[in-house]
Structure formats: structure tokens, C-alpha cells
Amino acid sequence: ADGAVLAERMIASEVDDLIAYLQDFGEEISIVGLEAGTLAQWLTYGLRDAGYHTVVMEARHVKSALGAMRNKTDRNDARGIAQILRTGWYREVYVKSLESHYTRTLLASRKALLSKCINLENEVRGLLKVFGIKLRAGLGHGPFDEAAREPILQNEALAYALMPLLEVRLQLYQAYLELDRRVKRLANNDAVCLLLMTTPGVGAITALTFRAAVDDPRRFR
């Protein structure tokens, strides 16, 4: 309570390692604080499951609080974070549910594959133009393979250079279609998403993205 340092230790950012250290600490632990970061949420899940009251502190607020320190070292930063936690001078970051993160991962995976498909389509278009071959504008992702494959196969040199690229794009597109089906299936089995999709213009992707972003609407009360 008086802010005295009882122990300092370098520990790997692993749930089991942190829990083992806290269990062997020998003093009552009222709260555990983590600065917001890539691993913070995963560590929070594990620590909370182990029974520790854990909060994630907003990184910019922590950085601002530590900015007045003259000697910036990992040890001094850790001490500063501990003091921020002790005094309560921090902004807590809401930790989204695992379900929300799984949904966001599915959406991000789908988006990444679509982006790669578009990049490869544009690459093929650009390379074909050098030889006077212009694929029509507005060509959808589905018909693209057939439209590009025909002129490529008519030229042995082009086929040698571009068919591997076209095959990779096709595989990516097929993987994208599978993820797209999974996203829509997930949305169609979620009561909140079904309600959101009754709004004109709101489809499965928008509904699921909003659902995952909000996670628990009760946190806004």
C-alpha cells in the first residue's frame, strides 16, 4: 500500500510462467496490471481464469504517465506501471471475449485472401497489357480465371510465365470462397446478426463485423 517494491523479476510473456511466479510470491495480490499490447488480452484471459483480478491499461495513458521519468529503462517502466496501478491513475481497456476475437480472425482471414486475389488479378492484367491483351473492365473474381486463361494458353511463352500465377490466384480464390461461406454461416446462426441483417443494406459481413466490434453492448452503459 505504501508503494514499496517487494520483488522484481524478468519473466517470459507466458500465462503459465506468470501464474507460477504469482503463486510463489508469498503475498496477497489484490490486482495485476498489464499495459495494452498484442499479448495483453491473451495473458489477461489466463490470469483471470486463475483467479487474479487483472486489468489492461490504455497504452497511450501509460506512456504519458511514464513520459516524465528521466531514466527510461525496462525496470523503471515496470516500477512506473506498478505505481500507476497502485494509485489508480489509469484508463482500463475493455478486454473482448475470445469469441469476438475468433470472429475477427475469421473476418480478417477472409479479407486478406480477397486482397491477395485482387492484387494478383491486377498483376495479371498489367502483364497481359504489354502484349496487347486487355481483359474487360468490371470482370468479377469468379469469371476472371476463364477470361485470363484463354489468351494466356494461346501463347506458349505467356503460358510458361503466367500460368503458375493464375493457378495460385485460383487456389486463393477458392480458399476465399470457403471462408466467405463460413462467415455467412456464422452470421446466419447468430440471433444478433440476423436482427442486424433485417436492416436494408446490411449483409452478413457488416453484421458480423459490427457484432465482433461491439462484443458486449452492456459495457457501454
What are these regions (language model features)?
Residues V55-A108, A147-P151:
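Short alpha-helix plus adjacent loop in nuclease-associated cores
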Residues L208-R218:
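Catalytic palm subdomain of template-directed nucleic-acid polymerases
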Residues A1-V55, S64:
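Glycine/alanine-rich phosphate-binding loops at beta-alpha junctions
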Residues T199:
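Histidine-centered phosphotransfer motif of kinases
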Residues V5, R48-T54, R70-R75, L128, ...:
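A short alpha->loop->secondary-structure connector
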Residues L107-L195:
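Glycine-rich, often acidic, oxyanion-interacting loops/wings at catalytic, nucleic-acid
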Residues A1, P217-R221:
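Short, intrinsically disordered, charge-balanced linker/junction segments flanking boundaries
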